[in-house]
Structures are given as C-alpha cells and as structure tokens.
C-alpha cells in the first residue's frame, strides 16, 4: 500500500511541473514557388571520386614502380645526345616527365592522323587543275573522285601519269597551245596522255597536227567523240593505275610440248594432231626444221599441201627481195578507131606492132627495172610511133580509093 501511494505522488508532481511550464508556439515555414525553383537550380552535383589522368604515361605510371617492370634499351639518338652532357644534367621530377610524355603522346597522333587522311584522299582521287573549272567534262566523271589542286597538267591520274585535255575546235583557234602545254610538263611523268575531244566535222588536218605533236614529244594520243567517252578514259586510267600488265601480256606455257604446239599450229593447215605426229617422229623442233620434204611426207596424216607449207616456212628467207625502184605500171593506150571502107571488099589489116605488144603484155614477161621518167618516155615514144604508122596507112587507103574512083569515072 505504501508503494502505491508513492507512485501516485510522483505522477502528481510530474503533472504539476508540466502544467507550470510556459507554452511555446511552434511555427512551420512553407517556402514559396520561386524559392523552390532557385533551390532546385542551384543544387550542386555530388563530387565524383573518378579522376581521369591527362596522359597514357600518367595512367600507367604505377607499372614503373612494380618489380616486373624493366626499362627499355636507350635508342641510338638518345644515347648519342646523353653522352656529351654527362652527369651534369639534373633529372626532372616525375611529374614533369609525365606531363611532357603526355603532351608529346597527345600531340603526335593529331599531326600524324591529319596528314595520311589528306594523302589517301589525294591518292584515291583524280587531281584536276584550276584551269579546268567550268569544263563540262567534270560532270561526267562519276565513278572516281576528283579534287581541284595546284598542278601543271590538266589531270593527274597517278604518281607517274597525267593527261592534257584538248578540244579540236580550240586547237583550230590556237594551234600552238598543245606544244606549250607539253613543254610545261618537262618529262616529269612516265605516261603523258593527250585526251583529244573531236568536236569538229573536218578532222583530217587538225588530227594530223595533233598526232604529229604528240608523237614528237612521246605522248599518248587518245581520241574521244563525246564528253562521256573522255570521262571514261580518265576513270579507266585512274582505276588501272596500280594494276599489273598481266591482262595484256601473253601467257606462255612452260612445258616443251605446249610451246611446240603453239609454234607449229601458227602455220596454216597444221593442227594439234600433226604436231604430235611430227614431235613423235623427229623428236625436237630442230630436227623438224632440218628435215627434207621426203622425210616430212613419210609422216602419217601429213599431205603434200602441209609438207609444202612446213618446208616453205622453214626455208624461205624472212626478208623478201624487193627492187630498189618502185614498180611502174604502164597506162592503158587508147586505140584509134579504124575507118572501114564500105565500097572496098578488102579485110581490115591489123597493126602487127600493136598485136605483138598486146601478146607481150598478156604473157607478162618481166621487164628490166625502170624509173618513172624512162618508163613514161618509152610509153610516149611507142604511142607516137603507132599514131604515125596509122596515119600513113590511112593516107595510103585514101589515095587508093581516090584512084579507084577516077578509073570508074573514066
């Protein structure tokens, strides 16, 4: 009972103390809309614990302090530069070395990366001179890139090939233009192409002049009759810049039988079976060449025509024996009409000299070598002789007819 009374007294005393304390006012502040926006905007991001290094050497600097790391051998240039200086040089701090290494490593890729990009673009593209601005040919170059550049020729198609564009219409106005343009090249290119656009109707004289100029200056002439054809030439030369010459080179077999077959089948009427027969009979090409016509005729399947072809091919001289003077062709001689007398019953006599000459011409006897002057003089002399003989015979006939008429009148 005593304990319960004590607890009741304590609780009463606590209630009395709480009641005696002054009551404090609690105020809750509500922020405005602007204060909320400002607080959200000025909210700072939490600091990140990741600190990236400035260079590759700084990022992997801990490798040098490990036991596994071994320094690389010094280069020849570094060794030569370090020998005269000796030990007087003061080593820089590790931070400075790292910074210099980082600067050099970061700067070199930029410099080396920018140059190859330009060079590769120029290598894969046709370099066009600024002189060709406005040329409609450039619109037709579609399969290959082209770039304007400060170059001497009109087009640079590779390291050793270039092209000069020429219009025949422009050549007629300026005949010396091509000569001066070729002279500017100064043989700096192995392949110099003159791309000639034929845009005139009368092409004989201008093409002759362009061909002569190109040949005298070791240039290759390519003629095109349209702008698209000119563009195809430029594209093809650029595409085949680094191609080997296997496409145009003849491929020769290495074995003896195929070479023998290739050489003997070039003779007319000789086939592959004949080559096998000749090879098995004589053994080699030298024995086939030295064989006589009788030996060749003994081979089965080779007739007289093939024997003659083979023998003539192996024994005829390579160079034909031609005369030093050009062969002279005699012009046809006009025949004078022979007047027939209706009253006379005598047959018309033919000129004996004319008949003999015609027979000789039919036989085609070989005449001695003549020059043009001697041949013409001989022809005119014969012609004058024949005319004089015919005139004399005509006069004799006229006199005989006149005398016959007088006798009939008497």
UniProtKB/Swiss-Prot annotation:
Enzyme Commission number, as recorded: 3.1.-.-
Where is the sequence biased in composition, kind Polar residues? 92-121
Biased composition annotated in UniProt, kind: Basic and acidic residues: 356-372, 383-410
- CDD domains in the cross-refs: ERCC1_C-like
Q: Where in the cell is it found?
A: Nucleus
A biological process (GO) of this protein is: non-photoreactive DNA repair
Region feature Disordered, mapped onto this chain: 1-28, 66-121, 322-410
**Pfam families of this UniProt entry?**
HHH_5, Rad10
Gene Ontology MF, one: 5'-flap endonuclease activity
**GO (cellular component) term, any one:** nucleus
Cite the entry's keywords alphabetically: DNA damage, DNA excision, DNA recombination, DNA repair, DNA-binding, Endonuclease, Hydrolase, Nuclease, Nucleus
Keyword DNA damage attached: yes
- Organism domain of life: Eukaryota
So what family is this one in?
Belongs to the ERCC1/RAD10/SWI10 family.
Assembly information from the UniProt record: Heterodimer with UVH1/RAD1.
What does the function comment of this entry state? Seems to be involved in nucleotide excision repair (NER) of damaged DNA (dark repair mechanism). The UVH1/RAD1-ERCC1/RAD10 complex may act as an endonuclease making DNA incision 5' to the lesion site. In vitro, is implicated in double strand breaks (DSBs) repair and is required for homologous recombination in the presence of non-homologous overhangs. In vitro, is involved in chromosomal recombination between tandem repeats in both direct and inverted orientations. May mediate the induction of a DNA-damage sensitive cell-cycle checkpoint during the G2 phase.
Q: What's this protein's name?
A: DNA excision repair protein ERCC-1
What gene is this protein translated from?
ERCC1
